[in-house]
Amino acid sequence: MDVTKSLLCFISFVAFLLFSSVAEANKAHHHEFIIQATKVKRLCETHNSITVNGMFPGPMLVVNNGDTLVVKVINRARYNITIHWHGVRQMRTGWADGPEFVTQCPIRPGSSYTYRFTIQGQEGTLWWHAHSSWLRATVYGSLLVFPPAGSSYPFTKPHRNVPLLLGEWWDANPVDVLRESIRTGGAPNNSDAYTINGQPGDLYKCSSQDTTVVPINVGETILLRVINSALNQPLFFTVANHKLTVVGADASYLKPFTTNVIVLGPGQTTDVLITGDQPPNRYYMAARAYQSAQNAPFGNTTTTAILQYKSAPCCGVGGGSGTKKGNSFKPIMPILPAYNDTNTVTRFSQSFRSLRRAEVPTEIDENLFVTIGLGLNNCPKNFRSRRCQGPNGTRFTASMNNVSFALPSNYSLLQAHHHGIPGVFTTDFPAKPPVKFDYTGNNISRSLYQPDRGTKLYKLKYGSRVQIVLQDTGIVTPENHPIHLHGYDFYIIAEGFGNFNPKKDTAKFNLEDPPLRNTVGVPVNGWAVIRFIADNPGVWIMHCHLDAHISWGLAMAFLVENGNGVLQTIEQPPHDLPVC
């Protein structure tokens, strides 16, 4: 009996130590985000931009895998706002996901809301951004997830981590740009500059003194955590005369591969190692547009930062290329791909492989075929100017499977689902397009240009094994669409061009080591196939991360039912959840 008691005491003591060590290792990080108007000067002009804590870009958050984030958002701006934690799985914490009218009503001016969630099984680079209107043009920042304490990277530990946020800047109020586009039905005005960490760089007016500078020592290896936080533009990124070793993307590790250039759609992140193995000098880091939509206007300019060797015999500290007169100390410029270089994009995306054997579902319960396309609606007869500003006097729209997604306004979708409120949404999103046609052909019937509008969800049972074929279409114009799924990572098991053919294209499926992503670039005039297991209950939107497109309705949402027991059931809503 005494032996049994002693053994039980010993087991209890060990369990206590283990619990204490886990509790100590997994920390809770508390932050306060104050949403406010801040004077920001770019391109010679000053604007009252919406920021977090007066910072543009916003605060960098640093956590370890397993940590909890508690972020109180206080809205002192004049717009409604929400914050989305892009790529965070939000296991059972869908109330913290952030998309406006999907998982919550917006935080009104003068109000606050506290986001609380835990990072589970993710390491690498994520980010956060506003998910209301076009406020994410200036409301965004990095979220760096390190391995748990005592663990290490599956690659050589870098000397430093450097987040690089690629963005867009409007010499105007981005909210007004969107409102004008919605009013007229036309495409929104393009941005006036691309940025790296909020700065346009040397090639734009009034910008060279504040160009982002990244210092490096000879022989030093740093990890560049590159994030495309631009609203509407996939971007190429490169560094003059340096190789980039890709080791991760969307907070998942990859088999390392070396490249001269990377490409990121809006929403995507890529981790690359770079080594100071060149003669000490100044080298431009540069980003420019990848534009796949034919005849669509875009900003054909280049943003730059500077990789500056600390032993370079040149420069004043902290400035751009204007720190010395003449050209002798100008940074070396890299060669970037042409704006329409789809071949480079394809080679890059097809180089991705998961670091280890992937747990890809091989049996499928739900098989969806989802077409992606723009559209054109007729101008309303009572429109004030009598002529909308889309092509031939129409209004732009967009859809998935011929359904243009409409957000509710009185309740969020998750609130309506959780409380059983009728009339907010339906669960009849089609698993395939209503009409089969030559999706990437040149002679698509104009009858397919006007989609239905609705708030249609697709219901999934907990634990369902899901496959989605995402098919680009030539309606209006084919285009590379970065499709982002909230609440989940998914395996990209194949991609290709033309119309997906299940009889021959299934042979291309990679079920061994496909990359795990949260945002997939569906090839222009092509398709991508993704798979995941529906193990996270809630309402999760899937949308194009080109913000012009989501404002036109290029989205849908999944309703994932609760499973069995507490661990398969979404948590109860927080007490301070905003009301509409």
Swiss-Prot record:
It is found in: Secreted, Extracellular space, Apoplast. It catalyses: 4 hydroquinone + O2 = 4 benzosemiquinone + 2 H2O. Cu cation 3 binds at residues 131, 486, 543. GO terms for molecular function: copper ion binding; hydroquinone:oxygen oxidoreductase activity. This is Laccase-5. Its EC number is 1.10.3.2. One of its GO terms (cellular component) is Casparian strip. Cu cation 2 binds at residues 86, 129, 545.
